[in-house]
């Protein structure tokens, strides 16, 4: 028996107050000989076993009734592989001792993690099934530099924090432990004795799967295989590609009619994916699928940044959904939330008893609008956690793009704060320099590591250079939501047509700044909640005029420079606001053909026509791709412009935003010849009045608007028409 183990050490170890369990537990060379020590609460008998022969090598004596065993092995001088035969409640179990294994994290990984430059921290941190020295199990690691003790607790140890205290790697602040026998599918958490001596039970920040609310445990789950991007998917994200995005909240797109329960990922693959393809969309954008405790956050307050929510199935089910989308020719955009996180006790908040992931000062670390906490981007390990997450979704799931939420709240220290409620940066300014550098670095790494993948910014201010390269002072995003265009055009459309002539600039102003960024035109979920009404219900007039206005607006939007985004339900003109707790109003499409069918057909035709004609998408971000033909006819609320492709082919777009048909409307054109009406939002096919131009019109050699040739058209009421030149 050893006399070297101090009673205070044993007490501290059993009480969970000892920070260095490997200095005590496991096999050690002592003056008395080779000694094995184990902490096995509730055990009554422990033997050391030779694995090759199964022979008992020595018995461990119980030095403390609470489960501390120790024994010197006779005739043994050198370290060897061993197992422990442990009797619990009259039943003997053969186990491998976690404390016989050496350090897990390689020195280079530890250094990169400390420097914040480990591109894929999720490959090292978290829970990973592994085989060590011929023993299968799971290696656990967690960053908690200020904790006094960290243990793994889970289904494999009765959630008892005494049984598996971890090793601290002081150079990195990471705790690690290999637990033999722990396997995929088992639940676990980390139990921390924090910097202040308080006990905390935390979910794994790097968990690849987690329980669905209200439960909060992490789940051991293997790292998914990498997904190789196809050339077609890469091309579909390019600036000259047609991009029409269908934005979806998976929990409310459609539900089971019998119990209002969600569709699963696999059911969504069978229903949502073919629908989006049939409608002609090119991309699916998913509101956040990261695990989150509060349904009403729509996923924008995530606690499991690396775990797809279990609401709709398993991690593999989600991969099945993504694969189905790709097989249907749809790219997938994931809404990503690196701006803030909820303050739930089980998550990142005060993780090790200190403000580890968030700022300590609430003027920097607390978001009063959402009652959430703000990441400390200046801490290298925190930024690394987030950058790694971006790569994780792109490389391991095949996500084609990330849409970054609430960028303005990240890059401005005074965002939604009054004077005295924020702290200036080191130069006295309002910019969050650390957040700006984080975004630049993230976009730079995406570009370097995932060819063809892109990022999109929801940025609501006039911050300059959101879509410019970091090396030129930009943030490095590929695309930016054009919230200014959205607000201006919706403000215009909600006006009674008689007043629109006084607000003509609402539709023209967007072109003054259109080429400053690479824009997406968004009619997103944010525009159909919180009392804003549905898009349809914002339109003025009686039912006929509401639908006509909406169709004219969509025709304008799909032709205007910029990529397109439409939130689910808007494609068939849902009349009520979005409710995340219920299905879309699919019953509006039941029964006989109606106005809702007309809008749905229009959106489908808009998508297919938009994709077919390069002039409508190839030069979205080049001034050559757009030209006004009629910009100043505010009295009649008429606007006409040309979209152009690289080869010079033109499509004419004419909108009449009054209910008065404009007959014999002459305007100058660039290219004389025969022009065909390829889309008319007033067509009877869409339940319009069917006013139009009979399909084909010929230009006249009559000067108009400073051009030698012109067209004489009928502009339908509250409508947009598209014309394509067919020949001389």
Swiss-Prot record:
Swiss-Prot/TrEMBL catalytic activity: Transfers a segment of a (1->4)-alpha-D-glucan chain to a primary hydroxy group in a similar glucan chain
GO biological process: glycogen biosynthetic process
Enzyme class: transferase
Active-site residues per Swiss-Prot or TrEMBL entry: 405, 458
SUPFAM superfamilies: (Trans)glycosidases, E set domains, Glycosyl hydrolase domain
Associated pathway: Glycan biosynthesis; glycogen biosynthesis
Pfam families cross-referenced by the UniProt entry: Alpha-amylase (PF00128), Alpha-amylase_C (PF02806), CBM_48 (PF02922), GlgB_N (PF22019)
GO molecular function: 1,4-alpha-glucan branching enzyme activity; cation binding; hydrolase activity, hydrolyzing O-glycosyl compounds
Gene Ontology CC terms, in alphabetical order: cytosol
Quaternary structure (record): Monomer.
Protein function: Catalyzes the formation of the alpha-1,6-glucosidic linkages in glycogen by scission of a 1,4-alpha-linked oligosaccharide from growing alpha-1,4-glucan chains and the subsequent attachment of the oligosaccharide to the alpha-1,6 position.
Protein name: 1,4-alpha-glucan branching enzyme GlgB
Chain's gene name: glgB
